[in-house]
From Swiss-Prot:
PROSITE patterns: ENTH
Lineage, top ranks: Eukaryota, Viridiplantae, Streptophyta, Embryophyta, Tracheophyta
Main location: membrane
An example Gene Ontology CC term for this record: Golgi apparatus
Key words, A-Z: Coated pit, Cytoplasmic vesicle, Endocytosis, Golgi apparatus, Membrane
This protein's record includes keyword Membrane: yes
GO terms, molecular function: phospholipid binding
Domain ENTH: from-to ranges: 27-157
Annotated Gene3D superfamilies: 1.25.40.90
Identification of the protein by name: Putative clathrin assembly protein At5g10410
Protein location: Membrane, Clathrin-coated pit; Golgi apparatus; Cytoplasmic vesicle, Clathrin-coated vesicle
Keyword Nucleus (UniProt): no
Length: 338
């Protein structure tokens, strides 16, 4: 009975919000009015249902037009004024799809991290909303990171759509300094590390809202895998190919630590492999090859360093022996010399 009452109240609030939006935007731009109405209809309080795809498509249709800022503002407004976990989760899904559909124009969620400010979000009205609240806190940080990927890379090419993009991306990355490639890769690995922190709570409800979040994250994951893979391939060539500008000692150390962090993500990310198994296998095979190569290079440096230390110690010992073998001579002066 309490569940039915909550459902009825939710329906009433949804209709009231839509009626208010019609009134508020009745004298404004028709496009802005449609954006707000489509957004409200896609982020209803109906539990266990993801945002209505038709209404989401209507919002996204403005993402590459001059009304893109209005679409983002409407979604962010909807997110920030609600205390309902179902509405907040659906709003985040809409924001995610807006980011994905307008990567070339999207300026990010702000000038820093944690712009969505959802770290304290909590809806304790039911077990379902408690479960969704954990996802909301994680998902907000995830979208903050996703919005910064184009800033880190300069763009967000989709290497799956056009094979030529992969060649162009590799040519572009090959022109970068090694340190810059490592910094880019470091940011992308941080993205993987955040995916590893996703909620692992047992699903109390077979919730299609959470299923859609997982689906969107998996799509992003494999796009990022392709971007990381291009950078690892360029770094691998610089490690093993003669005539190619080598990775310096400092860069090698940073790269080794980065690979260790990447390997530590593998187990947690393994649950996402099923979508593109071959790509995942190729990616982790490359990571293992690079890790082995960097370890070999580091071991070689350690051997050379040990040899240098041994030579230095031997030289010092010979110098001590030489000094010890020199007999002091006493010099006497005649008084007539003064």
């Amino acid at each position: 009975m309490p569940g039915l009452k909550t459902h009825i109240i939710g329906k009433f609030k949804d209709k009231a919000s839509i009626g208010k939006a019609r009134l508020v935007h009745s004298f404004g731009s028709t496009a802005v009015k449609y954006i707000h109405l489509a957004l409200l209809k896609s982020t209803t309080r109906t539990p266990n249902k993801p945002p209505n795809s038709d209404y989401v498509s209507a919002v996204i249709s403005y993402s590459n037009s001059r009304y893109a800022p209005a679409a983002f503002s409407a979604a962010l407004w909807r997110l920030r004024v609600t205390k309902n976990a179902i509405v907040a989760t659906k709003s985040l899904i809409v924001i995610h799809k807006l980011i994905k559909s307008s990567r070339d124009k999207f300026e990010g969620l702000g000038h820093g991290r944690n712009n969505l400010k959802l770290n304290e979000f909590s809806d304790k009205s039911s077990n379902l909303t408690l479960e969704l609240s954990q996802w909301i806190r994680w998902y907000g940080q995830y979208l903050d990171r996703l919005s910064w990927v184009p800033k880190v890379l300069g763009s967000f090419p989709n290497l799956l759509v056009n094979p030529k993009d992969k060649v162009e991306e590799k040519d572009r990355v090959s022109s970068y300094q090694t340190g810059y490639i490592i910094r880019q890769t470091d940011s992308l690995v941080s993205f993987f590390e955040h995916i590893c922190t996703r909620p692992e709570i047992p699903p109390m409800f077979q919730n299609k809202i959470v299923d859609e979040i997982r689906e969107l994250v998996i799509e992003d994951y494999f796009k990022i895998v392709r971007l990381v893979m291009v950078r690892l391939q360029v770094l691998f060539e610089r490690l093993i190919k003669p005539g190619v500008k080598p990775i310096g000692d400092l860069g090698l150390n940073d790269f080794s630590l980065l690979l260790v962090r990447l390997v530590e993500c593998k187990e947690s990310l393994s649950g996402l492999f099923w979508r593109c198994r071959r790509l995942a296998d190729d990616f982790w095979c490359l990571v293992e090859m690079l890790k082995a190569e960097t370890e070999k290079k580091n071991n070689k440096q350690m051997i050379e360093l040990a040899g240098l230390v041994q030579t230095t110690v031997k030289d010092d010992e010979e110098m001590i022996e030489l000094v010890g073998s020199v007999q002091p001579e006493w010099v006497t002066f005649d008084d007539s010399d003064f």
